[in-house]
Amino acid sequence: MTARHSFALALAAAALAPSFALASDDAPAAPPARAAAADKLGQARAQIAARQWSAALDELRRVNDTGSADWNNLMGFVLRKGKTPDLAASEKYYDAALRIDPHHRNTLEYSGELYLMKGDLAKAQARLATLTTECGASCEQTGELKAAIDRYKAAGNKYVSTGW
């Protein structure tokens, strides 16, 4: 491989690195079909990945794309994960996201986790059942919500945060 090819390969890898970082297992990722709409959410996603909840909330409010399931999902996520979680507002945004797209996998997972935070195991299990129907037992969101439910049960029906 020539130095020119090595440089081009390194440049391409560097350009793609932020994309991979933002698509980590813990941060909400945009489905490929929503890539164009997700561009305007990119800054908020970066702030979420950095756990800058207040900045992410400000950015999402600036974008104000209430007709987007992704936007509503991110609003719910930020409000649930912030320093002082607003569970009622988070639920409102998750519900809005699911009205727009009833198959939104991240919203199904995150709203299930919200229900665990609220002590509603039955609703969390219902979200898990929907996810299992949507994408099977092997999809990431199903596994994450199942693990959260297992932690909840193991802790005597108390929510256990993963630090995210």
What is each stretch, according to the model?
Residues 3, 7, 26-35, 125-164:
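Terminal, low-structured helical/coil segments at or just beyond the last alpha-helical repeat
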Residues 35-63:
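Alpha-helical segment of the N-proximal tetratricopeptide repeat
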Residues 47, 79-80, 115, 153:
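Residue at a conserved register position within TPR or TPR-like alpha-solenoid repeats
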Residues 50-55, 83-96, 119-127:
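Structural signature of tandem alpha-helical TPR/SEL1-like repeats
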Residues 63-66, 100, 133-137:
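Structural marker of alpha-solenoid helical repeat scaffolds
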Residues 71-73, 107, 141:
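TPR alpha-solenoid repeat register
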Residues 74-75, 79, 110, 144-148:
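Canonical tetratricopeptide repeat
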